[in-house]
Every structure is written in C-alpha cells, then in structure tokens.
C-alpha cells in the first residue's frame, strides 16, 4: 500500500527521528530515478516491442501518484522509487495482456530488494530498473453497452470453500457475456496462499478479472501499511489503479489502512486512503471528462473511510460518479448526503454489494452440501451484474444457485385467524430494493396497495436463526445475529378475508426501472389458532 504508518514508543523516538531522516534522504535519492518505456500495439501478440509495431500516443501511465501521457512516439517518463509499481491506465478500445488466470497484467513492479520477510511470500527482488518498461496493448471492440460481474467477499478459508464458490456461482456463470469481472475485496480469508486457487477457479469464466484488496487479503505481520500488500502485489499488481472500458472510467481503490497503535505491538486495520492515493485519484480524474461516468470500487464502504471527506472534495463536483464496496456482508443502496459531509448537488450513490460468501459460508447445507449462508439482512448470497449504456447504469442482484427472477422473499404466517388478519403483517424483502423503490401488494384479485418500507430485522432471517439455533450437533457454523435490512417492506393483510386459501401477490419497481414479482399463499381459518398452527 502507498501509505506509510510508523508506530514507535517514546523510548525509541530519537532513533525513529534518525531513521526517518535517513529514509527521507533515501527517498530523495530514489525519487531521482526515472522510468521510461513505450506503450505500443503488440500486433503479433508476443509481448515484445518489435520493429514496425505501432507506438501509441496519449496513453496514461502512472507511478501510483503522478500520471503522464505517452508522446507521439509512444514513449513516457515517470519518477520511481525502490518501491514503485508503474502501470498503464487501460484506454477504451484496448486490452492489456492477461496471465494464465485471466488477471490483467498492466503493470511493472519495481522492487530491487524484493519484499521483506513475511509469512506469505511477497515480491521477489526485481533487480535494477530496466532501461525500458514497455506496455503492450491489443485492440478490442468495446461498445457503449456492456456489463460487468461484481463479487463481494468470496472469502474462502480453504480449498473446500473455494469449491463452494466454484459450484455455487462459477458454474452458472461459465459462458457469460460480461466484459469483465471484479472481486470487491476479501478475495480470501486471511490465508493468502489461497489467492492462486481462487484465481484459477474464476479463470474458468474466460473474462478479464480485476481485484480490489480487502482487510482479509493483507499481510498481518507487516510492520506498516506500506508493506501490508506485498503478497497481493505479487499476485495482482498495484492495490489501486484505474482503467477505461467503453464510455466508463473505473477507479480501483485500496481503503484498507494497516497500522500498529503506539505501544500495542499488534496491528489492526481501519478504513483509510492516505494522501498519496487521494493525490492519485485527483490526478487521474483531472484527465477524465465530466461527461464520462466514473465508478469507484473499494472494499470498506465509503461512509466508513476515515479520510473520505478528502475524497468527497475530489469527486463531488462530478455529475456522473458512483461507488461500490463490499465488506459488511449485506446488500444496500446508500445515498450519501450533506449529513455525512457530502457537498455535491445530488446525493452520491454508493452500493454495498451482496457477498458471494453470504454470512461467511455459515448455516445449514443445501442439497449440494453447500451452506445456504444467507446474509444477516435476509439477502441470499450471490453477486451483482452491473450494466452500462454510455453514462447510464443499472444493477441487478443474482442469488447464487437460483433463477434470475428470484428477487424477493415474502414472509407471512402459514395460517392466520380470520379475526387477526388485519393485524397480521406481510413482510417482503426485495433484495436489490432501496428507498427509491416502489413495492405494492394485493390479495387475490384486489387492488394494488403500496407497502411501507421499514428498517428492521427481516423476520424470515430471524426465524431461520432461531430454528437452526435449536439444533444440536450441527456440522456447520452458526449464522450471525440478524441485522436491520434497508430493503424490507410490510403491509397488514386486509380484513374480512374468508376462511380458505388466499394468494398474496407482490410487485416491485426499483430505482433503475427493473420490475420483479413474487407470490405466497396464506390460509385463513375461523376461530382461535392452536399454539402450533403457524
């Protein structure tokens, strides 16, 4: 990571000051190094710049802070230190090379001495700065209409859970027409040796796959934040970067700050970006037209990032900007306003994406021996598909292993006393719903009636937790405690329902105009219910 965090006791302060002075002197020397190279059309696909291959002008290249453009000869120059990743900002209509796991290779990691000793292997020594760091690009068709797949927190602990992911989501996505995919952090669950197994599985989709760093993807034995992404860098390159696809500009952010509190000797993480990364975003967006949609992708939700106000100042004047995260293992559309310090003309749309792992692969197993792992807000585990059309976008939630039209869960008792029908609420969890959704209910062929949005625990999830909690000798991990859902609606049944079976219909229209529906049958009886009637 590009932020430096130094934690020392008072007794070591004098030594620290001397060390800092030496580091500053070293940085001053290192900053005089200049990387140079050519960005070119690799016509024969061999990954090498050959005679006659066309240099590409106007292509952006970055060192993680500064951004320069290639000249008419395709050449760039940019400053580097002994811990710099030089990378190309993929332009629209071009692709970068892909490795054997379909991970984009758009960078050169310059680390002459390699990573420090860590539990999980970092970057091997790269030696002296090459005379020319060249970046091959390949032309590809990128229409204004395209879609991408978003994975929140797959978070496998081991190979068994990598297999869960393979069977639960990868198999149904093979053959996708998505242009690329992104994992929004927590690629794995602390064991960084699982990066490779997870990447191999996702590679079967056959599309480029980008990665965001999460708090479970870092080196916990790192001495500071700057060294906490060494293993991530070895596998995936820079922890923050940007690229264009179609008419959209994507910015991947590293908002995991690793620090060691004074005197504690034990590291921890918090949401943070740091000055260098914010400077990169500022420099990056200065080269992006206002009419181009910008999509920020991160792990920790934006509202939980400590220096988010600095980022707000950079993006809030842009008319077209959204952000997407994971981390919290629920699904939510958040609209950031002045209540959180946002000063833009319109609220900022931030999506907290559903997680592939749901509730960390917990709960009873289904008929495939995969935990149902429902999120604590009642959202099924799964992923999102984000669609773009120029500067317009829409988001669809896809529940793992379910039909695409499974977009809601209706909770109502099996049986209700006729006398209590008007006092009995029907709840519907519209998984991708928000405060901008319209949700209505009717019973039988009655009138459609608007439902009321309510921020509370999903009673359906509460019932599952209660039911599974009573079991003994469970071979699975318990579900987490319920958390309030932001996409829950309720409405009481109408009065006067006759004894018999009645059909509840629900219809919903979300903020993107996407429609979904569901139904449930409830039985009405005369008289009092027995204690076990429902």
Per-segment meaning from a language model:
Residues 104-114, 119-125, 193-290, 307-324, ...:
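Extended active-site neighborhood of metal-dependent phosphoesterases/phosphodiesterases
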Residues 49, 55, 62-79:
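Short, acidic Ser/Thr/Gly-rich low-complexity loop/linker segments typical of extracellular
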Residues 30, 34, 116-196, 283, ...:
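N-terminal active-site segment of His-dependent metallophosphoesterases
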Residues 63, 85-121:
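A short, solvent-exposed loop/turn motif at the edges and junctions
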Residues 43-53, 428:
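Acidic, glycine-anchored loop motifs typical of Ca2+
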Residues 37, 70-84, 135, 485-491:
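Glycine-centered loop-to-beta-strand initiation motif
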Residues 207, 458-492:
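Aromatic sugar-binding surface patches on proteins
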Residues 341-433, 437-440, 492-495, 503-518, ...:
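Binuclear metal-dependent phosphoesterase catalytic core
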